Amino acid sequence: MLPPFYYKGVSDDGIFAFISGVIDKVGSPALRLFLYHIPPMAVVGFSLDLVGRLITAYPGTLAGLKDSSGDWSNTAALLERFPGFAVFPGSEVFLLDGLRKGAAGCITASANVNVLGIRKLYDNWQGPQAETLQAEITTLRNTLQAYPMVPALKRIVAHYHNDPNWAAVRPPLVPLGQAQSAALIADLGKLGFTLGERPQAKAA
């Protein structure tokens, strides 16, 4: 759940009142809420103190937080201050460091095209290949970030499935142009990238 972000410069008290109002109105013990901290987009975010207040007020409801601040120091502070609280870095760049501090995993847009590489690190983060696996997924992420992220991900799927319909995006986003698309696919080719597919079920 995002904080209310239309008004900027609002206080922790105001955000607390908004979140608590939603929880109280739902009024269900089954509710599990994940906070979405993404100040690069929303500008408004969840401070450490506010997260602590919400966890204390709703210990059975506040289930976790996705930290898309891009600021490792903030993610690390969340992990250190709230052990047992499910914190997910918003980029796989921080996956290994996060897991070593108790992160639950990561929630990242680029998993749409690199789920196998990211999952491999998640499964082997305590093994001898962990640093190498992290370097590989970081290199790919940095390549993707050199382009508008969502149009780039859509273009990759379109290219590897040979289906241009996948490249469509909703306004106000616009698809990558021909030059950018060609450059992106060339950059991926240099990395030996392939779009991993799920195994096909065998016929009985």
Predicted regions and their residues:
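A generic, residue-level signal for flexible/boundary positions that often mark functional hotspots
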Residues: P4, P40, I107, A167-R170
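C-terminal alpha-helical cap/extension of soluble enzyme domains
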Residues: A103, S110-A204
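Hydrophobic alpha-helix-in-membranes signature
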Residues: L2-P3, I38, F88, V150, ...
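Solvent-exposed, flexible loop/coil residues
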Residues: S11, L50, A76, L173, ...
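Active-site beta->alpha loop and helix N-cap motifs at the rims of alpha/beta catalytic domains
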Residues: M1-V44, P199
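Short, solvent-exposed amphipathic alpha-helices that sit
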Residues: A17-G21, L50, A152
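Catalytic alpha/beta core domains of metabolic enzymes, predominantly
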Residues: I23-L31, I38-Y147
